[in-house]
């Protein structure tokens, strides 16, 4: 899985990291998936990958209260 692929291959800044965690892979934001933003799988396919999934990893968002979060990771 490629952690940068869901962000177009770029390193993420703090706000981008939080957006990626909150918009695609959290339960409380799931109501916006498909309406406000693409699902993890659809975003990865848009980027030319075979798909993607939310994987529990160390959090990259400095504003979260936990050290782990689900992040969208694209398949190669």
UniProtKB/Swiss-Prot annotation:
Keywords, A to Z? Disulfide bond, Secreted, Signal
Annotated GO biological processes are: defense response
Q: Give each disulfide bond as a residue pair.
A: 18-25, 40-44, 54-61, 72-74
- The source's superkingdom equals Eukaryota
Show the InterPro entries listed in the entry: Macin (IPR029230), Macin_sf (IPR038456)
Q: What cellular-component terms does GO give this entry?
A: extracellular region
The UniProt entry lists the main location of this chain as: secreted
Cellular location of this protein? Secreted
The UniProt similarity line reads:
Belongs to the macin family.
Question: What is the protein's name according to its record?
Answer: Neuromacin-like protein
Q: Which organism is it from?
A: Aplysia californica
């Amino acid at each position: 899985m490629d952690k940068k692929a869901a962000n177009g291959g770029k390193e993420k800044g703090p706000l981008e990291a939080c957006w990626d965690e909150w918009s695609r892979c959290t339960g409380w934001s799931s109501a916006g998936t498909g309406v406000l933003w693409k699902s993890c799988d659809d975003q990865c396919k848009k980027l030319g990958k075979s798909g993607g999934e939310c994987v529990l990893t160390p959090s990259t968002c400095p504003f979260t209260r936990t050290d782990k979060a689900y992040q969208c990771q694209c398949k190669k």
